[in-house]
């Protein structure tokens, strides 16, 4: 017999990516390959690329959320490098992490020294009260 019509044999389960197993959007397999090819260590454990992909995904989501808020504050629907710059520099922890990073087309934060601002006169102080 040719084996047609035989019931039996094991049905192989549908392949599931390591990213979907970990509940991530970032590619765990690609991170693992890059860790191996990058000569960071002789061997790479199974959990290392999952952890690194999760950290990268978290940082990306955090920056994109803040940049989206900056875009919305400027009444724009598209995130541009300026919004990324504003998001990173206005967040204390992200600014510390990316302090030495230059963002192309990012511009600078608006900042006027207090001594350069016009001084309040007595008449302005009375009006403001």
Swiss-Prot record:
Record PTM N5-methylglutamine, positions in chain: 105
One Gene Ontology term from the biological process aspect of the record: heterochromatin formation
InterPro entries: Histone-fold (IPR009072), Histone_H2A (IPR002119), Histone_H2A/H2B/H3 (IPR007125), Histone_H2A_C (IPR032454), Histone_H2A_CS (IPR032458)
CDD domains reported in the protein's UniProt record: HFD_H2A
PROSITE patterns to which the protein is assigned, alphabetical: HISTONE_H2A (PS00046)
Residues with Phosphothreonine modification: 121
First-listed, main subcellular location of the protein, grouped into a coarse class: nucleus
Any one GO molecular-function label of the UniProt entry: DNA binding
Compositional bias per record (Basic residues), positions renumbered to this chain: 7-19
Posttranslational mods: Monoubiquitination of Lys-120 (H2AXK119ub) gives a specific tag for epigenetic transcriptional repression. Following DNA double-strand breaks (DSBs), it is ubiquitinated through 'Lys-63' linkage of ubiquitin moieties. Glutamine methylation at Gln-105 (H2AQ104me) by FBL is specifically dedicated to polymerase I. It is present at 35S ribosomal DNA locus and impairs binding of the FACT complex.
Residues where N6-lactoyllysine is found: 10
Short name of one Pfam family: Histone_H2A_C
UniProt keyword terms in alphabetical order: Acetylation, Chromosome, DNA-binding, Isopeptide bond, Methylation, Nucleosome core, Nucleus, Phosphoprotein, Ubl conjugation
Record's subcellular location: Nucleus; Chromosome
Region annotation (Disordered) ranges: 1-22
Oligomer and partners: The nucleosome is a histone octamer containing two molecules each of H2A, H2B, H3 and H4 assembled in one H3-H4 heterotetramer and two H2A-H2B heterodimers. The octamer wraps approximately 147 bp of DNA.
Family note: Belongs to the histone H2A family.
Protein task: Core component of nucleosome. Nucleosomes wrap and compact DNA into chromatin, limiting DNA accessibility to the cellular machineries which require DNA as a template. Histones thereby play a central role in transcription regulation, DNA repair, DNA replication and chromosomal stability. DNA accessibility is regulated via a complex set of post-translational modifications of histones, also called histone code, and nucleosome remodeling.
PANTHER family listed in its UniProt record: HISTONE H2A
Full protein name: Histone H2A.J
Gene source species: Rattus norvegicus (Rat)
Gene name in the database record: H2aj
């Amino acid at each position: 017999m040719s084996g047609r019509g035989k019931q039996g044999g094991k049905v192989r389960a549908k392949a599931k990516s390591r990213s979907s197993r970990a509940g991530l959007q970032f590619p765990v397999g690609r991170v693992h390959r890059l860790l191996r090819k990058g000569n960071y260590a002789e061997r790479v454990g199974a959990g290392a690329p999952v952890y690194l992909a999760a950290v990268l995904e978290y940082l990306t989501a955090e920056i994109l959320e803040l940049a989206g808020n900056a875009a919305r504050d400027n009444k724009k629907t598209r995130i541009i490098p300026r919004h990324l710059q504003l998001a990173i520099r206005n967040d204390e922890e992200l600014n510390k992490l990316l302090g030495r990073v230059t963002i192309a087309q990012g511009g600078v934060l608006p900042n006027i020294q207090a001594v350069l601002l016009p001084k309040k006169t007595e008449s302005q102080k009375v009006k403001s009260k």
